[in-house]
Amino acid sequence: MGSKRAMDVHMFPSDLEFAVFTDQEIRKLSVVKVITGITFDALGHAIPGGLYDIRMGSYGRCMDPCGTCLKLQDCPGHMGHIELGTPVYNPFFIKFVQRLLCIFCLHCYKLQMKDHECEIIMLQLRLIDAGYIIEAQELELFKSEIVCQNTENLVAIKNGDMVHPHIAAMYKLLEKNEKNSSNSTKTSCSLRTAITHSALQRLGKKCRHCNKSMRFVRYMHRRLVFYVTLADIKERVGTGAETGGQNKVIFADECRRYLRQIYANYPELLKLLVPVLGLSNTDLTQGDRSPVDLFFMDTLPVTPPRARPLNMVGDMLKGNPQTDIYINIIENNHVLNVVLKYMKGGQEKLTEEAKAAYQTLKGETAHEKLYTAWLALQMSVDVLLDVNMSREMKSGEGLKQIIEKKSGLIRSHMMGKRVNYAARTVITPDPNINVDEIGIPDIFAKKLSYPVPVTEWNVTELRKMVMNGPDVHPGANYIQDKNGFTTYIPADNASKRESLAKLLLSNPKDGIKIVHRHVLNGDVLLLNRQPSLHKPSIMGHKARILHGEKTFRLHYSNCKAYNADFDGDEMNAHYPQSEVARAEAYNLVNVASNYLVPKDGTPLGGLIQDHVISGVKLSIRGRFFNREDYQQLVFQGLSQLKKDIKLLPPTILKPAVLWSGKQILSTIIINIIPEGYERINLDSFAKIAGKNWNVSRPRPPICGTNPEGNDLSESQVQIRNGELLVGVLDKQQYGATTYGLIHCMYELYGGDVSTLLLTAFTKVFTFFLQLEGFTLGVKDILVTDVADRKRRKIIRECRNVGNSAVAAALELEDEPPHDELVEKMEAAYVKDSKFRVLLDRKYKSLLDGYTNDINSTCLPRGLITKFPSNNLQLMVLSGAKGSMVNTMQISCLLGQIELEGKRPPLMISGKSLPSFTSFETSPKSGGFIDGRFMTGIQPQDFFFHCMAGREGLIDTAVKTSRSGYLQRCLIKHLEGLSVHYDLTVRDSDNSVVQFLYGEDGLDILKSKFFNDKFCADFLTQNATAILRPAQLQLMKDEEQLAKVQRHEKHIRSWEKKKPAKLRAAFTHFSEELREEVEVKRPNEINSKTGRRRFDEGLLKLWKKADAEDKALYRKKYARCPDPTVAVYKQDLYYGSVSERTRKLITDYAKRKPALKETIADIMRVKTIKSLAAPGEPVGLIAAQSIGEPSTQMTLNTFHFAGRGEMNVTLGIPRLREILMLASSNIKTPSMDIPIKPGQQHQAEKLRINLNSVTLANLLEYVHVSTGLTLDPERSYEYDMRFQFLPREVYKEDYGVRPKHIIKYMHQTFFKQLIRAILKVSNASRTTKIVVIDDKKDADKDDDNDLDNGDEVGRSKAKANDDDSSDDNDDDDATGVKLKQRKTDEKDYDDPDDVEELHDANDDDDEAEDEDDEEKGQDGNDNDGDDKAVERLLSNDMVKAYTYDKENHLWCQVKLNLSVRYQKPDLTSIIRELAGKSVVHQVQHIKRAIIYKGNDDDQLLKTDGINIGEMFQHNKILDLNRLYSNDIHAIARTYGIEAASQVIVKEVSNVFKVYGITVDRRHLSLIADYMTFDGTFQPLSRKGMEHSSSPLQQMSFESSLQFLKSAAGFGRADELSSPSSRLMVGLPVRNGTGAFELLTKIC
């Protein structure tokens, strides 16, 4: 037992603590003092005192034993050390030292905060260490009140009693529990980090104690410096010094003196801020030592040679890169010692070599040379941490390079374990093996082996295997005795094999021997295909040994789980080496248990391609077989059964005994259902729709009535008592589809039965297809002459729609001549970057109609051969292979080719391909292919088709790395989340993330039938198979059920009585008694409570009220009772189900009252069986369920299908925004607010007002004339006339009026224009101010040199273009520009400048508004306009300014610019500035649109977010249903729970666009994890900072940074997270590791 305990101590660590060795501890650990950088002598022997001294252990090919422990191979190595000449900073702590020095005065060494503030911080840190997290947080809230009270002795201890009772209570708590390191959670870690960071914030400029200027220490160029003022220098060197202030480098020994003084004053504070100071086992308080010496290094540890082995290049020994760093340190240390020796005794004591080294040092004086030598030593020590910290060090590996990145020590070796007993080869398909089998080549079966203990029961079999030896299967490779010694079985010595076999059980005293036998049929192997994106990527298969094969043989059904095909894919096989591992592989990881995908609970396994065709042909009506064929096919499907097969009677007796194809399948189903279970009943549908079977007019029945709809048609599948009565079985029933036959068999009888059925179907379909055959011919794709003529006619028409599409995009009423249309099209392309989008939309809308006409003409009625005789249609409609799009491309046309959702772009020449003319309007030039594969396509069409294929390949290649990193971030954060025995979901530090997994506690794989009407019908039809009487009797507890039903009745009664608006009792009390509150200044805020005085008066009244009155209020306005599952745990109380399940039961009972008790019992039993099992690693499954489907998404940003091209970020970029970045500045923020009924007109006005408008949207043209004037000096003269569009043109889109435009021009725009001109002309702002001269007459200038002028952006077309109002496509760039404009917007952002819509309900007819406003505001605003004009004219550059005072449609300005400046390009400046100048904008909102939602509601959608602005329009908008995609904005406004729901909805919406479904339980778990601490935290390095496991942090990324933090704070890792346990070689505590098994031996 003693040895067992010792093994537990060493092999099974319980926790791991990070600390720092002191110099004394390093010397004690060291076995040699390293004094020379020379490693080997001329003979290749290690030099004593060198870096490969034999006392530190053997190295490389050295055969000498270790000089310390005298071992050779087993020597772990021993540390050495280097004595440094002077202290250097420990590079781990240098930044922390800098932050620490900033809060202390370096004159008096006092802390720069009040004593009671310091005491509170210390108290908070002690509370956190003791595990009192809530109390520490309360103290943080309480701190502001205490700090506000200006009493220094507020928290001082007097006679053992605290002055403040709250503080006293905290100290009493600490007396109970001073330190509890096991309470380390992510909450405590994040709170401790926050408090520490706040305590280390830089404070005032002068010391609060000695009143001297603070020396703020900075970290510059990897050194600590502080600024020395002139006064400091004069004080040191005398009053006559004239030197100015300068930066002074702080030497390590000087800094150490500072910190020792600080520690002497504040030992407890420093130990709490830097816990590592109190962890050392060495007494650091004796002599001149101090715990803060840990921040510095006098002695440098040297790693053993085994950690830096020598490299052999041929016969030459080559040093390790890390050894080179140590050599550099030794050399620099030697030079430093030379300088120190010189400073002590002069040159006389130096050797010639030392003198030479001294002279080569940079610096004039000895002190300067000492600084140079010390700095070199410090840099070389820093390189030991990170080689990138030195520019000179080109090679070498620091600690950072050793442990970080994928190839680093942690991820490559400590996390990535390499395994034996594995095989890898190519996979090939095999339909003849079972679904849960894997075909293994016999060469693998002989090499892989399994250890079997020899017992009396298996010795005979094992002896035969030993006799066969390693080369004959089944054989054995070697025998292992009780001591672990292995004896290889010889292949060429039969007599020795015989003797080894006889000795297997010869002497029981020798202990149990173990025979390593070959792989046998039925052994389980773990198959894995990389990338392993989700749980089914590794499954357990039973081995089937195949002789003469070289590849793995895999069943088709498993391809989807592995995402495998047979085009050269390779897979790995792993052979479990213990009975526990085999048990898990057989029962948990096996194929039968992985039939459903954890992502959404849908099936993974299913038959494909040929088997689907065969199944349809076999089960089609009219297919009959004689007795021989019937029994042959049944035997093919059931050959693996080891019991009597039940056969069905024939369908037809006369004239011949025949069985239908349906009966063959029915026989298989009946025989596979286990004995004792009721047979399956199923009503379902086939994939082939009923209309496809109606190829001719139905024949009226001889007797009876016509069946209605699809009744009794082949599209309706009906199974009764296990017999297929109606319908064909196609992909819908035995493919990887939800609620098909295989899925229903899985639900009723389990995975083994469904897997067996799949295997049986595979074999019978394979055999039948060999009899029946299947092929495609040209006849299957040909269309009739009539259809082909119609097709050609439609194609001729569609080739001429190009001009119409362009005219519609240009908004031309009449279609102009072709040449003129091309010119306008070219001008539109140049002018408006959004024109292409509009043109694409017009082309698509026109061409879609023609495409649909062609398809409906040719398919399916236009085909020569009709379904089901048409094999291509049979293949597509049954789901075997292909889609209707493929058949259309073959027989009809290819249609429009799109690249990233757009038509192929034009080159700079205006051509899409060189074979087209510039700006050609034909659909063909835009990628519309009217050809088909049957008759061939043109070269241009082929090129467009290849472009689309190339886009898919590029997108796949690029997104792989993005989605891979996304999944890694998810996995590393969520790896510790698992279900516990109380059904809560907790992290590895025991933090509760969810009280019920997925909010209902149900496992996704077991709850797929808790769904719709079909599921309830199916479950009741098969109630006898689900509700087995014995099980129901054990589960059903009438007493428990009565309690649950009483609670549910209580909830129902509350729901009936609940008022329209839910309010609390206190709210009603306040409304009734608000008149009785009498307080002075009722609206004044109490700074202590944050409440109004009036509200505090109401609270006092409520507190004074009688208990009976309060009880009456509470009874009348009672809250809704808690849900049943919150009161009665589902695993303990029979009948406790979620609200959703309760609703399903109630709805079904209303439809079928007779089955009320049946469906209720079914759902209750299924709830208990479907609960998530304790130990289930739900975090990993959720991460995989997001990461795996993300590989199917593209990287592009798609557009909102509405007016104004509202951009919406989708795909991986949006997932990264939400999950990895948790960004508060998302790329496309938006709001969706429903419009109240009857408010559409007012909502339209609001939409117009919300649209942001730039000056470019309002300008018709700008005319610029350039001249030269000579008076008063030579200068350029610019005359600019700005002509604005009439308001009728833009009033439907923008809420700005002409008067406001003019006001914006002379108040803001011209200031910006002058500033831009001066900037381009290299004129500084200072020059502009200095050059101002006396005002000259504006009209005095000559215009002798006037140009003809040019017009910027003249537009003769209609200017009502939505797209021109849009800002730049690049949202990020737009954001930057908006930030840059903030200072400019201050000039015009007051209420007079920008029209604001206060209440749209007050607006009357627009025409009246216009007239009244223009007339009414003129008189009020004239003064403001005149002053603005005066300010503009006061600028020296402005010579004249005038504007249209009547209609406000133009303004004109004349500017002068000295010829001393570079002549600017005004055209480009104005164009750029007009596009950036915002005339009107509601803050943070660019534009708005109105669209119709899913429920036919009208919604207002905004590009940008301003929730506060929306609150002003509560009469128009339904603010109770406001939604925004900005999670931070929702969290700030509505709280973190609302934000959590937005995360779920947003991630779900991202996947929904691609037709991907992810179960809500996964999303809710991720959302709850990200909002765990009340804030929205990303799944990134920033979010990982809050983890309580340092090893988990280091295994993610930035390993060195997290290692520094763990060492500095002296953190301990309890080895509870999966990553930390893997790193130290322990099994993870999830899954089967969550518990231990106790075996009953006797």
Curated annotation (Swiss-Prot):
Subcellular location as annotated: Nucleus, Nucleolus
Region described as Disordered: 1337-1428
Keyword list, A-Z: DNA-directed RNA polymerase, Magnesium, Metal-binding, Nucleotidyltransferase, Nucleus, Phosphoprotein, Transcription, Transferase, Zinc
UniProt GO BP: transcription by RNA polymerase I
InterPro entries, sorted: DNA-dir_RNA_pol1_lsu_C (IPR047107), DNA-dir_RNA_pol1_lsu_N (IPR015699), DNA-dir_RpoC_beta_prime (IPR045867), RNA_pol_asu (IPR000722), RNA_pol_N (IPR006592), RNA_pol_Rpb1_1 (IPR007080), RNA_pol_Rpb1_3 (IPR007066), RNA_pol_Rpb1_3_sf (IPR042102)
Posttranslational mods: Phosphorylated.
Positions of Mg(2+) binding: 565, 567, 569
Compositional bias of kind Basic and acidic residues: 1351-1361
A single MF term (Gene Ontology): DNA-directed RNA polymerase activity
Top-level EC class: transferase
One GO CC term on file: mitochondrion
Pfam families: RNA_pol_Rpb1_1 (PF04997), RNA_pol_Rpb1_2 (PF00623), RNA_pol_Rpb1_3 (PF04983), RNA_pol_Rpb1_4 (PF05000), RNA_pol_Rpb1_5 (PF04998)
Gene3D superfamilies: 1.10.132.30, 2.40.40.20, 3.30.70.2850, 6.10.250.2940, 6.20.50.80, RNA polymerase ii (3.30.1490.180), RNA polymerase II, clamp domain (4.10.860.120), RNA polymerase Rpb1, domain 3 (1.10.274.100)
Reactions that this protein is recorded to catalyse: RNA(n) + a ribonucleoside 5'-triphosphate = RNA(n+1) + diphosphate
Residues bearing PTM Phosphoserine: 1364-1365
Acidic residues bias locations: 1340-1350, 1362-1373, 1386-1424
Residues bound to Zn(2+): 66, 69, 75, 78
EC numbers, comma separated: 2.7.7.6
Known partners and oligomeric status: Component of the RNA polymerase I (Pol I) complex consisting of at least 13 subunits.
Its job: DNA-dependent RNA polymerase catalyzes the transcription of DNA into RNA using the four ribonucleoside triphosphates as substrates. Largest and catalytic core component of RNA polymerase I which synthesizes ribosomal RNA precursors. Forms the polymerase active center together with the second largest subunit. A single stranded DNA template strand of the promoter is positioned within the central active site cleft of Pol I.
Family designation: Belongs to the RNA polymerase beta' chain family.
Annotated protein name in UniProt: DNA-directed RNA polymerase I subunit RPA1
The organism's taxonomic lineage, starting at the top: Eukaryota, Metazoa, Ecdysozoa, Arthropoda, Hexapoda
